[in-house]
From Swiss-Prot:
GO CC list: cytoplasm
Gene Ontology annotations of biological process type: peptide biosynthetic process
Family note: Belongs to the elongation factor P family.
Full protein name: Elongation factor P-like protein
PROSITE patterns the UniProt entry points to: EFP
GO molecular function: translation elongation factor activity
Organism: Colwellia psychrerythraea (strain 34H / ATCC BAA-681)
Pfam families found in the cross-reference section: EFP, EFP_N, Elong-fact-P_C
PANTHER family: ELONGATION FACTOR P (PTHR30053), TRANSLATION ELONGATION FACTOR KOW-LIKE DOMAIN-CONTAINING PROTEIN (PTHR30053:SF14)
Superkingdom of this protein's organism: Bacteria
Length: 191
């Protein structure tokens, strides 16, 4: 049984008789009292899809739920559902747009390394790769010779995500984006 301080994003835990997926974790250290850190977790109920906010002490013991990750690819959008196809047996997995709203910003038809998270034979979420390559659809014109400066400008990506990029990057460039920090990592290798 792991401690609350060991739980990571996209983990599945059992709490109060429910299976919950961890969507976000915020660590806080209360001032003026003895004791450890507090971990505020935004959780999603696997069955109802409802949001649950819980706070745990660092030493609280939690149970992992039985979960598996299936390598998949984004296939198509069907109304309010995103459909992913299993890379091995071509099983389609339907996920509600709301339950994967944060991850949608990093997914296009070419995104590789996606895993569908399965709990009790039902898809409950997706795990993204550490970085993805996305196309810049709109940004200010590039400035020649600006590669040495550390100034940045906003850039709109093909998925609707806006990130800060160096001034020498222009519209139409493909860039690598860190999915955890939502930050520019560099130009994508052109092949």
């Amino acid at each position: 049984m792991p401690k609350a301080s060991d739980i990571k994003k996209n983990a599945a835990i059992e709490h109060n008789g429910k299976v919950l997926i961890v969507r976000d974790i915020t660590r806080s250290v209360p001032q003026g009292r003895a004791g450890g850190s507090l971990y505020r977790m935004r959780l999603y109920d696997v069955v109802t899809g409802g949001k649950v906010d819980e706070t745990f002490k660092a030493e609280d013991m939690l149970n992992f739920a039985d979960l598996s990750r299936r390598p998949s690819m984004f296939s198509y959008i069907d109304g309010e559902e995103y459909v992913f196809m299993d890379n091995e047996d071509y099983t389609p997995y339907n996920l509600n747009k709301e339950s994967i709203a944060d991850e949608i910003l990093f997914i296009d038809e070419e995104t590789q390394g996606i895993s569908v998270i399965i709990v009790d034979d039902a898809p409950v979420g997706i795990a993204l790769p550490a970085s993805v390559e996305l196309l810049i659809t709109e940004t200010d014109p590039s400035i020649k010779g600006a590669s040495a400066s550390a100034r940045t400008k906003p850039a709109l990506l093909s998925t609707g995500l806006t990130i800060q990029v160096p001034e020498h990057i222009s519209t139409g460039d493909k860039v690598k984006v860190n999915t955890e920090e939502r930050k520019f990592m560099g130009r994508a290798d052109s092949k």
